Structure formats: C-alpha cells, structure tokens
C-alpha cells in the first residue's frame, strides 16, 4: 500500500538536494548492564521497563523540539539504539558529560529507591551525539 511522504522524509530530501546528508533521527538509550547481574539480578522485564520509562520521559520532556516532532510523525520509521553501561558510575559520568555538552537527555531514576537505571536522549541526528556514545556497545 502506498502512503504519502511524511514531513521528516521531506526534510531529509530537502537536505540531500541542498548538498547536505539526510538526517536520520535516532533515540539513544544507555541502560545499566549490572542490574541484570548479581547482586541485583533484576528480571529482563524490569530492566526493559526502565528503558521504556526513560525513552518515554525524554520524548515527553522534549516534545516541542523539532527533532522530536519529526521523529514522532514517522512512527513506523522510529529508530532506537540501546547501549549498555557497565555500572552506575559510568552511567552518571555519561549524564554529567551530556549535561556539560548541552545534549538533551533524561537520567531515569527508579523510585522509591532512587537508583539511576537508564539515560535516554531525545531524538538526534546520530552524527551530533555519536562522539559521546561511541565507547558503549549494544545492550545484550
């Protein structure tokens, strides 16, 4: 079935036509791997829920940003990349770096324990944020 071309795709085509590369918007999440291992041993569903909470919160907090709006207009083309941080310290250091570099994100804290579990960035063109995330591998 043929569908109309969405605004995000049109923006990408305009950029490509003007000599710029098309912007592929990606929402990156960085999830603590140690939560799946002893002494925590959280079930997979609980860890996945943390990533879902963080992603939803980041989208909501930055809902008025043009990248977020474009990302949400193309529901069937959403791209998310889930990376792993080995521990809480690494996750907090990343949050500090993102804050210093003015990269929009949400550090999700599990309540009532106040445990930092996941960072979700708002949707970004991957080339704008890859330098901050390149040391993290895909979550397994």
From Swiss-Prot:
Query: Is-annotated flag, keyword Hydrolase?
Result: yes
Assigned EC number: 3.1.1.29
Q: Keyword Hydrolase, does the record have it?
A: yes
Q: Which GO terms describe its molecular function?
A: peptidyl-tRNA hydrolase activity
Catalysed reaction, written as an equation? an N-acyl-L-alpha-aminoacyl-tRNA + H2O = an N-acyl-L-amino acid + a tRNA + H(+)
Give the enzyme's main class according to its UniProt record, as a single word. hydrolase
Q: Which UniProt keywords apply?
A: Hydrolase
Instruction: Tell me, in a sentence or two, what this protein's role is.
Output: As a putative peptidyl-tRNA hydrolase, it might be involved in releasing tRNAs from the ribosome during protein synthesis. Some evidence, however, suggests that it lacks peptidyl-tRNA hydrolase activity.
UniProt family annotation? Belongs to the PTH2 family. PTRHD1 subfamily.
What name appears for this protein in its UniProt entry?
Putative peptidyl-tRNA hydrolase PTRHD1
What is the name of the gene encoding this protein? Answer: PTRHD1
